[in-house]
């Protein structure tokens, strides 16, 4: 069978042209492969963790993560309010409770509840990924959950939009018999049984 390849053709035909031999390459040290790119969530979680740890180091005196408690976390969340972009109307404001205020006011900008809730979720995961024990996770404490609930409720009232908890969908029970398309029920009668 004839080959369509030219590989080895010069040798088979007695060609006098020298064949090029692959030369061994000198050993070059290889750099370690680049780690896989982090997902957006993982990158944000790492940034949040580094920011929180830096916040603790900047405290007077500095606080180590192993000594961090819910009071440090609550202080951090309140510190973040200065960078917030959500207008939260105070009780004395004429726009308090209005869904779409008609004008401007001097009410403070704060972190939105959803942003704080997501932040705590990422920090909770990062704490455990960095060696923290789940049962000692300060981000999972009851005080943090109460704070987030209060922020959610107060922001909802200030905006005039009540927070509604989503109802969980009931799963259909596949074991229940349903009426057939022909109007019969899922039960069989003795007349349908083979004898």
Swiss-Prot record:
InterPro entries per record: ALOG, ALOG_dom
Placement of sequence motif Nuclear localization signal: 165-169
Top-level lineage group: Eukaryota
UniProt cross-references to Pfam families, sorted A to Z: ALOG_dom
Extent of Low complexity compositional bias: 184-195
Annotated compartments: Nucleus
One of the GO BP terms on file: post-embryonic plant morphogenesis
Residue spans of biased composition, Pro residues class: 21-36
Biased composition annotated in UniProt, kind: Basic residues: 162-175
GO annotations of cellular component type: nucleus
Keyword DNA-binding tagged: yes
Chain ranges passing through the membrane: none
MF (Gene Ontology): DNA binding
UniProt entry keywords in alphabetical sequence: Developmental protein, DNA-binding, Nucleus, Transcription, Transcription regulation
ALOG domain span: 40-167
Chain segments carrying region Disordered: 1-41, 154-195
Family: Belongs to the plant homeotic and developmental regulators ALOG protein family.
Role of this protein: Probable transcription regulator that acts as a developmental regulator by promoting cell growth in response to light.
Protein name: Protein LIGHT-DEPENDENT SHORT HYPOCOTYLS 7
Protein source organism: Arabidopsis thaliana (Mouse-ear cress)
Lineage of the species this protein comes from: Eukaryota, Viridiplantae, Streptophyta, Embryophyta, Tracheophyta
Gene name for this UniProt entry: LSH7
